[in-house]
Amino acid sequence: MSTVGSSSEGRHSVRCFRHRNANTFLTYSKCPLEPEFIGEHLFRLTREYEPAYILVVRETHTDGTWHCHALLQCIKPCTTRDERYFDIDRYHGNIQSAKSTDKVREYILKDPKDKWEKGTYIPRKKSFVPPGKEPAEKKPTKDEVMREIMTHATSREEYLSLVQSSLPYDWATKLNYFEYSASRLFPDIAEPYTNPHPTTEYDLHCNETIEDWLKPNIYQQNAPGERKRSLYICGPTRTGKTSWARSLGRHNYWQNNIDWSSYDEEAQYNVVDDIPFKFCPCRKRLVGCQKDYIVNPKYGKRRKVASKSIPTIILANEDEDWLKDMTPAHVEYFEANCDQYILLPGEKFYKTGEAGGSI
């Protein structure tokens, strides 16, 4: 079976993946490879599990691109904890346990453009029915319906479409939950980070304060057991605070509210922009550069984030100065964990004439 759970490790996901099944259903989206090439690759890859039957079908998607389905049956259960185990070249294979091989095979063969088979198909075992008796029709339970949907769906869109057609009332009343489960079943593959913000030279009266904070907290790695320090910048709008903060490297960026569902474990730092003190969730953990804490995403399950200590850059305009809303205890914690820079009149995080520095 294929399972997922929470984990703070992993480059592509914070989930723990496990697949163990003799029958495996694979989908290669936007994949133009020949079925024979895919099938022979799967046969060599799973030789230790004694492959008995492989079916690979190529068909066209609604947008005109090719994609391939494969049914792999082995004598021994195919076991892996690597969600990229079945990847071929740059094409990622979505892995599902084929709990109903008959239905999976029927689904794969619904509209084939090219097909390749090897071995002898092993049909699903059926319950014994005495001679002269017809098997009773049994209405599938919701669990069975959802199991079939999760087995056959190949994308978030197809998953939600199948839920809508099979369970219309649940889809209408619990759409948020289905959207969350769709995002967990079909997570986005993390792309290499590209910084969209050019570096800027700031025009400050006290550059040393910023430089002294940057070196140990952004440019240097943590020593074992060491925690970073955050940075608080308060000042007028259009002084380049946001552009400068976002130009330093890979980061989590939140403006107006914090969405934990998009938390990037590979980020070097966080940016909290224009979020009032009293409306910033987990502010103590963010300011204190803590790690391995539990958050509660909207419409999602509680999860652990921050596998490492990273600093947070907090940006505020003068009318939302965090220090004005703090109790003495808040101020004490803030000063112990966060450097502060209050912009004076005329100070900017860009030189006059630089493009993109007016945020």
UniProtKB/Swiss-Prot annotation:
Name the residues that bind ATP.
Answer: G235, P236, T237, R238, T239, G240, K241, T242
Q: Known Pfam families for this protein?
A: Gemini_AL1 (PF00799), Gemini_AL1_M (PF08283)
Question: Where's it mainly located?
Answer: host cell
Chain ranges for the short sequence motif RCR-3 as given in the UniProt record = 107-110
Q: Name one GO biological process term.
A: DNA replication
Q: Where does a divalent metal cation bind?
A: E59, H67, H69, D111
Q: Name its cellular compartments.
A: Host nucleus
Q: What is known of its domains?
A: There are 3 rolling circle replication (RCR) motifs. RCR-2 is probably involved in metal coordination. RCR-3 is required for phosphodiester bond cleavage for initiation of RCR.
How the protein assembles, per its UniProt entry? Homooligomer. Rep binds to repeated DNA motifs (iterons). Forms the O-complex, which is a Rep-DNA complex involved in the initiation of RCR. Part of the C- and V-complexes which are RepA-Rep-DNA complexes involved in the c-sense and v-sense transcription.
> What's this protein's name?
Replication-associated protein
Species in which this protein is naturally found: Panicum streak virus (isolate Kenya)
